[in-house]
Amino acid sequence: MDYTREILTFQFGTYANYVGTHFWNQQEANFRYGDESEQVAEEQLPNNDILYREGRNDLNRTTYTPRLLSVDLSGTLGHLPVTGELYGNFVQRDEELLPLSTGEELEQVRKRAEESGVCSPEQLEVQEQSKASISEYQRDLLKNAVVPEKNYQLAATANSWVDFLYARYHPRTLNVLPGLIRDPTAQALGTYSAGTEMWQEVSFNEEFCDRIRLYVEECDGLQGFHVLFDIDDGFGGLAGKCLEHLNDEYSRASFALPLHYPRITSYPQADTRLSHSIRVVNNVLGYHQLSEQALMFTPLSTLETIWRNNNLKSRSLPGLQWETDNLYQTSALLAAFFDTATLSYRLRQTPESLLRFCECVTPAGRKMTAAGLALPFGLREGQDLIEFLDQSGDHALLTQLTPGCEPGTSYVVQSVTARGIPAERLKRPRELAGDQLRMAAYSCDSISHMLQLYYQCTYHGSVTNAAATPLPLKTQLPFPYEMFAAGISRDGYRLPEGAERETGSRVDSAPMLAAVQNSTKLGEHLDNVHAQSHRVQLAKLQAYSNSGLERDEYDTALDQLLEFRDLYADSQYL
């Protein structure tokens, strides 16, 4: 029987919602409407029904919204109604109608309510709310007047993920934690234990679990869950308990992505030293829960390391420049990885599934994996893939997005996905091939086949599953296109040495490569987490003392983290 194998996505925390916003914006950018013609064949596009659901709003209009549950603090939604903008009995006010009075402006609102079908004038009760701040991009979006060439300066002005959100959500998607207001200077939900306590509160738990159930009951063949969450604060505890609930109730595959902020995390009433200790405890408890509850998890950060990194040393990607601690820009990179890495089991014509994808890169119980990214991919204009890979030699194609982690080039198990490389860029026709004919890779007949051969030759004793689609990463608004260097062409290829894009032109799309990797060397990442725990004096952490975390509970988590690390010993390989 042919049916959709759906995935339900979760986003816990502010940074997770930054990443998720870019991810959903990318999905919308790939939608096709009407007679739009693209170079990408239908079967090479994502099957949007895996992540989206069709419904009808109060006006009996068809909606198509992400199958998503998002959790964040009060104060992050700004102008965005908690019910979203496609449902509900509210009317979005025009800028010129603010503030609302009892005169002509009110009559205009009544007329608009009647025309939109929300209710009749007799049924209309007007309750005016104070004006919420709204970004220039969102204001233009509401008026359907976004100018793609306009510089909205989102990197400098975005104060929340809603400022650059293009996708529209279902009423059950947004969940705001009561009594916790976002503070840019400190984490309001500070500790892992605070997150677990929040999950156990009846006011939150019952409604949230009901929303999960409603989503699941709509599915024909639910295959699993994507879980993005901030691991440095209490949202890790919330996500951990949610994973436990999902396993108990639904027994489906779960791919978790713990996200580290690209800046030094602060907590209420804690100096730098105490803040570091709180973050260590949060990570220890979070990793322990992930090792038990997730089928696979991949820590993500644009920082080289998250421990004792006071200078915020960031990873670097050739052809890109970004502000190290900018949430809007860094989250776009993590979202690009997430979107590309998961394409292999989201394409319309693919035998892959989330379960098989996870199992292929987690041998011997090694649930933790690493993330590799190449954005843009690095091909020069007019260059074929066979030449690019031949000239790369031992030079790594990928930059790591898992902090403090280098999987190496031996005994690696990995899933690699390439996007945006057209089939005609694979190699030259035989009559024009020249030296390419002497290369073993010339026998390859697809992008994925050639990548598989490349890693077979350059990664000793490794296993690679490669997939490819000609669909590039779309980098128009609201993606932070300003990150691309001048030496990158509009379609994301490297220009000749010294050449630059036309002044005022922007990169519209880019080829890229993403990989989920596993090897014995990932044990070093777990060693780093455990090493930091020696500096922690749990009794001095008032935030944890108040939450009731027992020393025995913490020691048990540490011991089991060491047992999990033992799975990455050489003797456990395959």
From Swiss-Prot:
**InterPro entries, A to Z:** DML1/Misato (IPR049942), DML1/Misato_tubulin (IPR029209), Misato_II_tubulin-like (IPR019605), Tubulin/FtsZ_GTPase_sf (IPR036525)
- Return the protein name: Protein misato
Instruction: Quote the gene name from the UniProt entry.
Output: mst
Q: What is the additional note?
A: 'Misato' means 'beautiful dawn' in Japanese.
Q: Name one GO biological process term.
A: positive regulation of mitochondrial fusion
Task: Describe the outcome of a gene knockout.
Answer: Irregular chromosome segregation during mitosis leading to death before the third instar larval stage. Larvae show abnormalities such as absence of imaginal disk tissue, and reduction in brain size.
Q: Where does the protein principally reside?
A: mitochondrion
Q: What is the lineage of its organism?
A: Eukaryota, Metazoa, Ecdysozoa, Arthropoda, Hexapoda
Query: Which family does the record assign?
Result: Belongs to the misato family.
Gene3D superfamilies in the record, alphabetically?
Tubulin/FtsZ, GTPase domain
Q: Does the keyword Zinc apply?
A: no
CDD domains in the cross-refs: misato (cd06060)
What GO cellular component term, any one, is given?
A: cytosol
Q: Which UniProt keywords apply?
A: Mitochondrion
Its subcellular locations are: Mitochondrion
